[in-house]
Amino acid sequence: MSQSSNITWHDSEVTKSDRQQQNGHKSVVIWFTGLSGSGKSTVSVELEKALFQLEKHSYRLDGDNVRHGLNKNLGFSPEDRKENIRRIGEVSKLLVDAGTIAITAFISPYRADRDEVREILEDGEFIEVYTECSVEACEQRDPKGLYKKARSGEIKEFTGISASYEAPHQPEITINTEHQSVEESVSTIIEYLKNKEII
């Protein structure tokens, strides 16, 4: 899909800094990545609640939810996965511009795609959170029954079974959900945000 040459970017009269000042905190993307069943959605839900309790403005974008609307025309081929992440990256950037903490929970299996999202944001605005968990543990949890379907061949291109997952080399935060509770994981992230003076 080619971009039209007849479009112009229109800057807002209200800047990102203005919005951040009004909200009382910086705006960033907290990007959860990890295998299905590794705890991305579970931890991100609790993180959003914790930030709300701290009176910080945040909004959570979940992989399944987004595929009901914005990305419902995308499948799970490598090309569609790439486009899925590109769109979420752009939406996240808009949320950051609005002075909000964007929380995203997507498998986002390809390192290059995550790095592309990092590149469209300013330095320090992309916080990669790796929910580290073995395939065996994720499969044992299997909250949606997806691993069972993948093993039986019912689901093709399933990350961790028939499609690859590229773990981050240097994520800002790693939470090992086999050994850390949800509460401990959320505390780790909140502590990071405070130490970096984001909140």
Swiss-Prot record:
GO terms of molecular function: adenylylsulfate kinase activity; ATP binding
Keyword hit for Phosphoprotein: yes
Biased composition (Basic and acidic residues): 10-19
InterPro entries, per database record: APS_kinase (IPR002891), P-loop_NTPase (IPR027417)
EC number(s) given by UniProt: 2.7.1.25
One matching Pfam family: APS_kinase
Catalytic activity entry: adenosine 5'-phosphosulfate + ATP = 3'-phosphoadenylyl sulfate + ADP + H(+)
HAMAP family to which the protein is assigned, alphabetical: Adenylyl_sulf_kinase
Function: Catalyzes the synthesis of activated sulfate.
Protein name: Adenylyl-sulfate kinase
Organism: Staphylococcus haemolyticus (strain JCSC1435)
GN (gene name): cysC
